[in-house]
Design a protein with these regions (language model features):
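C-terminal peripheral helix-coil segments that are non-catalytic and often amphipathic
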Residues: 85-93, 128-140, 163, 173-203
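Amphipathic alpha-helical packing segments from all-alpha helical-bundle domains
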Residues: 81, 117-143, 154-158, 182
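Amphipathic alpha-helical segments used for helix-helix packing
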Residues: 82, 97-118
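Hydrophobic alpha-helical connector segments
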Residues: 70-102, 153-160
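Helix-turn-helix
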Residues: 11, 19-53, 57
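Generic hydrophobic, amphipathic alpha-helix propensity
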Residues: 8-17, 33-34, 58-62, 66, ...
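Short hydrophobic clusters on alpha-helical segments that form packing/core surfaces
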Residues: 12-20, 90, 164
Length: 203
């Protein structure tokens, strides 16, 4: 009969997220992980497999809380508010990150995804989910007449995703709200539909 685990799996996985997030995949050793998680190396292997398997679990945990839960929470807001709140939370997270760890997703995209086809697929699934969220908000905003009709909805969503990733990279160098919000103001201005009666032809 298998012995019950002598640790809280959610708690130690969160510790693994913090360890990988702070140091990256390559620089993090199994010894580092075991020390951060408060378990032995043997317990780590028995519970989670090797370092690569644990990294994927940590990545999935981060994505669930940092991306999918946020999308679900913002989905039913008015479309412009949903988009702006998504970005505002990213700016706030950057401001509250004195270690300048950046975004685990972006870090993984740069470090592992180019060299690991399987993991690249996981990253693309997350990026696609974010772009789909932005596309839904653009389409809803156009139906309400509050989002510009310039450009295909998926291309506008791709622009928003690109700006988001750039914002997260820049935040590792300069997370000041002044700089980050300064990047976003013209983006949001481009996103808004022109006022009615300005001579713009209807769609």
């Amino acid at each position: 009969m298998a012995r019950p685990r002598a640790f809280d799996e959610a708690e130690v996985l969160e510790a693994a997220v913090d360890c990988f997030w702070s140091q990256g995949y390559e620089a993090t050793s199994v010894r580092d992980l075991a020390a951060e998680m408060g378990i032995t190396g043997a317990s780590l292997y028995n519970a989670f497999g090797d370092k690569r398997a644990l990294y994927e679990l940590a990545f999935d945990r981060y994505v669930r809380a940092g991306v999918h839960d946020r999308i679900a929470r913002l989905e039913d807001l008015p479309p412009l508010e949903a988009i702006e709140t998504f970005f505002a939370e990213v700016v706030e997270n950057a401001r509250a990150d004195p270690a300048r760890k950046g975004c685990f997703l972006v870090n993984a995209t740069l470090e592992l995804a180019p060299h690991d086809p399987e993991f690249r697929g996981h990253v693309m699934d997350v990026l696609d989910a974010m772009q789909a969220f932005f596309r839904r908000q653009v389409e809803k905003g156009r139906a309400l007449g509050v989002v510009t009709r310039s450009g295909a909805a998926d291309e506008v969503a791709g622009m928003l995703l690109g700006q988001l990733l750039g914002l997260r990279v820049l935040s590792r160098v300069d997370p000041s709200p002044e700089r980050l919000n300064g990047m976003l103001r013209p983006l949001f201005a481009l996103l808004r539909a022109p006022p009615q009666g300005d001579g713009t032809a209807p769609p």
